[in-house]
Amino acid sequence: MAKAPVNNAARRVSKKVRKNIADGVAHVHASFNNTIITITDRQGNALSWASSGGQGFKGSRKSTPFAAQVAAEVAGRAAQEQGIKNLDVKIKGPGPGRESSVRALASLGIRIASISDVTPVPHNGCRPQKRRRI
């Protein structure tokens, strides 16, 4: 049975509401292949996010510090529009975009209250992958 056509005029696209949140948390996930920056409020609700790949960098250029800097600037500007002024930064992963993303957030005028490394370290859990031979 065919469904009745949906009237597009009946659908409403709500305008993005500007929240006024002063404090937040910047989660920087820096892997060897990409860097993802997510800015949340204190409860963990995402306000903005950006990644190196989402900014047009492809392949090995995604994993550069410059790509991480561009992604951090995009996420930071979107968070500033939501009212963010102070950030706690949590960095996870060993990638090359760790430091440059924090510098980019600071250069936007956002006050960095603390920087913490939350990279998960096993207490001798799972067996690691085989060693790379290049």
Swiss-Prot record:
Subunit structure comment from the entry: Part of the 30S ribosomal subunit. Interacts with proteins S7 and S18. Binds to IF-3.
Protein family membership: Belongs to the universal ribosomal protein uS11 family.
Swiss-Prot/TrEMBL GO biological process terms: translation
Molecular function GO terms recorded: rRNA binding; structural constituent of ribosome
NCBIfam families: PRK05309.1 (NF003698), uS11_bact (TIGR03632)
Function text: Located on the platform of the 30S subunit, it bridges several disparate RNA helices of the 16S rRNA. Forms part of the Shine-Dalgarno cleft in the 70S ribosome.
Ribosomal protein found in the keyword field: yes
Naturally occurring in which organism (per UniProt): Leptothrix cholodnii (strain ATCC 51168 / LMG 8142 / SP-6)
Protein known as: Small ribosomal subunit protein uS11
Keywords: Ribonucleoprotein, Ribosomal protein, RNA-binding, rRNA-binding
Keyword Ribosomal protein belongs to the record: yes
Annotated InterPro entries: Ribosomal_uS11 (IPR001971), Ribosomal_uS11_bac-type (IPR019981), Ribosomal_uS11_CS (IPR018102), Ribosomal_uS11_sf (IPR036967)
A GO-annotated cellular component: ribosome
Pfam families referenced in this protein's UniProt entry, alphabetically: Ribosomal_S11
